[in-house]
Design a protein with these regions (language model features):
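Long, positively charged leader/targeting segments at protein N-termini
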Residues: 1, 19, 27, 33-193
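Hydrophobic or amphipathic alpha-helical targeting/insertion segments
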Residues: 1-2, 6-13
Length: 193
């Protein structure tokens, strides 16, 4: 089985989280990691033990979906665990990494992506494989904390290229997200994306 397309992003988030825990030089994304560290990321039935899932979800199609998601995660973990451990040692983040610790950091990265990521595909565009899907999955610090609202739309967001991104001192990526209001907001009104 091939891992899902979000695994490449989860690996990047995992390595960045390991950097945060092993050095005093914080990454550009340090405040975002601090925010993520305050989340339990255990609200999805994917992360519950099977006894709890059966007790709470018996008779629901969500039970089988959660079991499949858990199996997918375990498959992804089996595919990437050795590479993640090797990267952590090669980058001198840790002399060796306990696999249970590394697994939990990776699990939290996957959970964050599942609950907070945006897919940047254009309307009507479909990802044809896991690699293309991975290229279209992004985490957008701060925007993912916004209240979501679909009907009627109050804001829109779009990706804009960052020109000369390679000349920047800090790796911020090649794109920026720009949010625009679709209505006039009064002071104190909630802004929902």
């Amino acid at each position: 089985d091939r891992p899902r397309g979000d695994v490449a992003l989860a690996m990047k988030v995992t390595i960045d989280a390991l950097h945060m825990r092993s050095t005093i030089q914080y990454s550009t994304w340090a405040p975002y990691h601090w925010l993520l560290d305050r989340e339990d990321f255990d609200e999805s039935p994917t992360w519950w033990d099977d006894t709890t899932r059966v007790k709470l979800l018996r008779g629901s199609h969500v039970l089988e979906m959660a079991r499949k998601a858990e199996k997918d995660f375990e498959n992804d973990w089996d595919v990437v665990k050795d590479e993640l451990a090797e990267i952590a040692v090669d980058e001198r983040l840790f002399p060796s990494v306990p696999m249970d610790f590394l697994r939990e950091v990776f699990r939290r990265a996957v959970a964050a992506i599942h609950s907070r990521s945006f897919n940047t595909s254009m309307p009507g565009e479909e990802a044809c494989d896991a690699a293309q899907e991975s290229e279209r999955t992004v985490l957008v610090p701060v925007l993912d904390c916004a209240n979501h609202h679909r009907q009627p739309r109050e804001c829109q967001w779009q990706m804009n290229p960052i020109h000369h991104w390679e000349d920047r001192r800090v790796d911020i990526g090649k794109w920026s997200i720009v949010v625009g209001a679709l209505k006039d907001f009064k002071p104190g009104d909630p802004v929902r994306i």
